[in-house]
């Protein structure tokens, strides 16, 4: 019995199945393992002596009652696994709680504008949706704050849209014609719209503005170019191979040494004898007789016609034109030629004194910088092919008659004194004005571009005033005019490049 008792203490226990295959109370239906073997019985012999006899008793080791000191430790039992507890997810309370209780329990993510309204909440990284009543305070707050954004009222981010916004305001303000306004797309070749805006501005704000050797059309044309440059600078539009103003800042250095002039190459111009013959009835012939009575005379040419012959011993030309005849230029020439070197230097001094009078803070180096137009109306279009003749505007010094007779002491305006002390102005004309009256069939293009250096500077000032008058709350953008640097593309061209004529109806030129 003792052996059976020991075996009962070490009886087999149920094995807990693996996770996911059941619990201890419901083991899976599989064959149970065999019980471990019973320990071997060890017999001991004990001698029992009584008063009359001696008896040997066989006592089993398992049946001995050990002493308290010799009691073996209880067998170690395997640790019991704690049963898994099933988590019951509480159902969402759909009762109508107060607004404070909702904010305390969950974080409100949004309130949709659907019908019926939906309350979107987020908690522990999860989103839940709840249908709200129309009278709920959250619904009223969402209807007031969550308005649908109109796409047409989004902030302007495109450069083209910024430029079109400015131009639409200008065209509306100065009442530009409807056909120009409807076809305007902020393209580089649409300079006529800018010129029209400046023309209307001059007629309204500065009617009767005094000009010297400058046509009204050229003044508004240059103002339109500057306005286009301001619009492009404001909208951050940049062109790779085209400059909207068509101008450059030229450090001429023609006033440093008396009697020394420089051409566009930056080299010193050479002195050359020059003889001019003009028709007696022409405007140039009459002007030569009035301005230079000591050097101009009326004679007969080799064909027997009466002409005004003007001899210039102080003519200046480019170094590359030293071996060329009168009005002839080499292929390396810059096209700069002055019939009177002293008058040309006087014109440069006049502009320098004129700018110092308007801007007293200028230093000597800044006063020698001259704003010059490089392109006239003939070659200002983007992608224009070089034509025959001069590639830059022609510079001609014009003398101001009767300016020397004015009393210097009676004039207080410093800008006027600059012209009195230096009675000559540098005038910029078409690149090739000689083609205007030419009867040759292969004559190049020409235009009536004509503006003096002081009026060109005045065109820039008027354009700035137009911007500030039209947009008082908008900062005047910074207009970037490049510094002049001599390039091979400015060379005089004696031969025009061949140009093709589009013929879209044929794929083969020899398809007769």
Curated annotation (Swiss-Prot):
GO MF annotation terms: DNA binding; zinc ion binding
Biased composition (Acidic residues): 96-105
Signal in keyword set: no
Region (C-terminal arm, DBP binding) residue spans: 495-512
SUPFAM superfamilies (alphabetical): Domain of early E2A DNA-binding protein, ADDBP, Zn-binding domains of ADDBP
GO terms for biological process, alphabetical: DNA replication; DNA-templated transcription; positive regulation of DNA replication; viral DNA genome replication; viral DNA strand displacement replication
Taxon lineage: Viruses, Varidnaviria, Bamfordvirae, Preplasmiviricota, Tectiliviricetes
Protein name: DNA-binding protein
Family per similarity comment: Belongs to the adenoviridae E2A DNA-binding protein family.
Biased composition (Basic residues): 79-88
Record comment regarding domains: The C-terminal arm bridges DBP molecules together, thereby creating a chain.
Compositionally biased intervals (Pro residues): 69-78
Residue ranges of the region described as Disordered: 1-105
